[in-house]
Amino acid sequence: LELLHAFVLVHDDLIDRSEKRRGLPTFHKLVEQRLGPLSTAERTGHGVSVVVGDLLFALSVETLQGTSFMEGHRSAALKKLLSYITDTGVGEIFDILLGSRDIGRVTAQEIERTYLLKTTRYTFEAPSVLGAVLAGASPEKQEDLALVMEPLGLAFQIQNDLLEFSHFDSRDQLLPTDLLEGKKTLLVHEAYERLG
């Protein structure tokens, strides 16, 4: 699951043009720095990031397939894993499309749906439910676990949005990254609604 998480973050950072993650340069920025001031450094960083993300995806599937869990449990977990990856991709598309719209034309429900698909599914639900599947938990227990993880994942994403502003260093840049990138977060949406 760590490989899956890294796969999503490498692609997400590239799509968002993020320069840092957890205070360190993102993967595509590392590639650009490594290549130096070449005219193609940025393009190369982007291209390598896409392929590295793809490799991490393949490795996450291969790692699951190589485990010693019962075949039926492993197959069920792989099916769920691929479903989570699909949801994450759809959520990323929603995030990109929301980014192209004016904040006044975006609803809190659309942002929450994006959070659920893009973040909650793979950060909270997938690790918990996949562990339950591999342990042989019933479909009902898996569903119960997914329902418990949903609000935790949403809370995590909202906290992450708040941290973007609370750890903002105006010496580094003029505005927090989410604002510079036009991210449609619940925090930005709420501020718009109140200040409208």
What spans do the regions from the language model cover?
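Mg2+-dependent prenyl diphosphate-binding active-site environment of isoprenoid biosynthetic enzymes
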Residues: 1-196
